[in-house]
Amino acid sequence: LKYFNFLANASVCRGIDLKNDIPIAYIPPDLIRLQIEKNIHFLNNTLEVMLVSKQDKLGEFETQTNGYQLLNYKCSYTFSRYENIHQLIFQVTNILNETYYNHLSKIKMIMPEAGRGFNINYRMHF
């Protein structure tokens, strides 16, 4: 599609204790990230889907975490003023308010990750 950018990346990590033939602790689950981006002059819109698999290849003292899907949105407006580049950024994270647990979190047994969130940022590049 004209004027759209499609981005995709994947992350797969394996760690095995060769001496004991067991998984190493704190290995992240498999992840696929898909993004569609639309630029309109100085306005950039990005919709992102993150697909994270369950982690059941567990090291000592670890507990299994379920897989999850997240939907995120980011809109940024870029402009120049006084020889500097400025950006206004609006983000909505976890749009669907998914309850999920990050396998690498030290507090996953206590509470899930944050639900839907809104962020407004200002950046100045000089």
Where are these regions (language model features)?
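Conserved C-terminal beta-signal and adjacent last beta-strands/turns
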Residues: 2-12, 22-126
